[in-house]
């Protein structure tokens, strides 16, 4: 029985020593037919090199020396024993663990923003911020579209715009009231209040440009500037 102590030289090559003891039995017989035997324990010393061919299979070269086998009084001698050996060993349970499968993270979904535009003349009477019945019907259709988009993690922004008739301050206030009227109605239909907000844009960002600059009559100017009077709805995070 021996204990093995090893030291790695490279990843595949080790040197080692074994120290321990060996239980032996020695038998002797002389020319006259006299027989005798002896048993005992002797120290064992060994050293060698071991090379791993694969993680499971290794070959080794070893020299083992055993001190004082036998008893001169019984078997007629007390020799030492030296043994040079070459061997192959198989080590169980050395299979390499499979490398963990690295799963690439799923790409983040692309955040999109949808834009919708409603004519204020459909939603409101001129210079008013209270929804008309036909305006409510238009928003019912809009709510159905928003529900189909299902912006669970997104938000809805309602932007109110006016034309340039009137003062800047008045138009700013009117655009805010109109945007808020749309927000309140959509909340009543089921959009969470923390997912929707109103913003008044006043007479900014007109879509008519200078096409109405030469229109002087008030009624004709109101008709010409109708595209500027609008409500835009932005749905973010779809």
Swiss-Prot record:
Record field: transmembrane: 1-8, 13-21, 43-52, 57-64, 83-91
A Pfam family: OmpA
Keyword Ion transport: yes
Entries under SUPFAM superfamilies matching the protein: OMPA-like (SSF56925), OmpA-like (SSF103088)
Subcellular location per the Swiss-Prot or TrEMBL entry: Cell outer membrane
Principal place of residence: membrane
Chain's role: With TolR probably plays a role in maintaining the position of the peptidoglycan cell wall in the periplasm. Acts as a porin with low permeability that allows slow penetration of small solutes; an internal gate slows down solute passage.
Protein name: Outer membrane protein A
Organism: Citrobacter freundii
